[in-house]
Amino acid sequence: MITSLNGIIQGGVSVKDFSTVTEINLDDSEDILNNFVDNGFGTLTDSFYYFEAGDKLKIAISFLQHGLPLDEISIALDWRDFEGLTAEILSSKNFAVIKNLMLTKPRMEIDVVGIRLGIAILIDCKHWKTYSQSSLSSAVRKQIERTKQYVAKTPGSTAVPVIVTLH
């Protein structure tokens, strides 16, 4: 079922194309696509299933709600979807969420900010399948610097740096 996420692309997709991409047989592919449409994900027009931006993420969240494993779902997502999933998880826990917050002088970007009870969680999403100790150390240093800049530019704020990875 998780492999069906690979077939969710913006624009129209036929059952045959979906089946080819996901390596799911034609009958099951059609059942899966019809199930998506029945649950409000995408539309069916002239034998093509149309998905909008965000449908893949919504389906991934639905999979999580049905108990499918987060690590397997995350692998099927690209980095934008992974950031969106991180933001959705925070939002579901009553955090106010800001995505892609830009800081200036120096220019820095924070992927996801979650704020609750006066504390900001500043998240750098790394869609890494594997990583080295040096790349992780570098990411940690950069995220600490982003956090220092955020606190310096946001009077009275308290912030925690976080890095979210797949593995």
Question: PLM features: what roles do these ranges have?
Answer:
Residues L68, D124-C125:
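Short beta-strands and strand-loop turn motifs
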Residues T3-D81:
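Interdomain/boundary linker segments immediately adjacent to catalytic/signaling cores
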Residues A87-P106:
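A short acidic/basic microdomain associated with nuclease active sites
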Residues D111:
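Cell-envelope/extracellular polymer assembly enzymes that use nucleotide-activated donors
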Residues C125-H167:
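Catalytic cores of nucleic-acid endonucleases
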Residues G114-D124:
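Active-site beta-strand-loop-beta-strand hairpin of nuclease catalytic cores
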Residues T3-N6, N34, E88, R141, ...:
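Surface-exposed alpha-helical segments enriched in charged/polar residues
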